[in-house]
Amino acid sequence: AWAAVALGYTTTQASGLVGVVAIGTAAGALAASVIMKLDRATGVIPLGIGMGLLVIGMIAIHDVRVAAPFLALLGGLGGYLVVPMNALLQHRGHNLMGAGRSIAVQNFNEQACILGLGAFYAGMTRFGLSAFGAITVFGLAVAGTMELIRRWHARNRVRHQDEVERLLAIARSDKH
C-alpha cells in the first residue's frame, strides 16, 4: 500500500522493492555473521528501536531514488538484528530443550508474528487508517516493543545477574 500511495507503484512494480529489502537483509545478515559474537548478541536490541523509528521515515519518501537505498538500509538493519537474535534464541533453546525442538518453536513464533503483524496492518487499514498512519503506528509499535525488551533484559541483568553471567560464560565458551 505504501508504494502505491507514496510512489504511485503498481503491485508488480512494488514487488521489485521487496527485492531491494532482501538484498539489504542479506548484506546485514552477512555482516552480522562476521562481526557479532554470541555473548554480545543482545547489544543489537537498540537497532530494533532504531528500525521502528526509521520505518516512520517512509512516510516522507516519494521518490524511488530515495526509497530504494532507504529500504536497503532497513533491510540491512533487519538482517544485522535477526542473525544474532536467532543465534541467541537457538543457543538458549538448545540448552533448554534440544536443537530440533528449539528451532521448531522459534520458526512457529516467527511465522505467528508475521501473521499477527500482517493482520494488525490489515486491521488498521480496514478501519480507515491511511497507509502513512498505519506505517507510523507500526513503527511506533516495533520501537516500543523493542524498548520493552531492552528494559526487560536490563532488569534481568540486575535481578538474575548470576544466571546471566553463567549463560554468558557458556556463550563465550561455545565455538561454533
Where are the predicted features?
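Short amphipathic helix-loop junctions that connect adjacent transmembrane helices
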Residues: 1-13
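Multi-pass alpha-helical transporter architecture, strongest
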Residues: 58-59, 137-172
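A membrane-interface helix-boundary motif in multi-pass transporters
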Residues: 10-13, 42, 119-143
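Small-residue hotspots at the loop-to-helix junctions and early N-terminal turns
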Residues: 11-19, 100, 104, 135
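Transmembrane alpha-helical segments of major facilitator superfamily
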Residues: 16-25, 106, 110, 141
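Substrate-agnostic recognition of the 12-TM MFS/MFS-like secondary transporter fold
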Residues: 29, 70-121
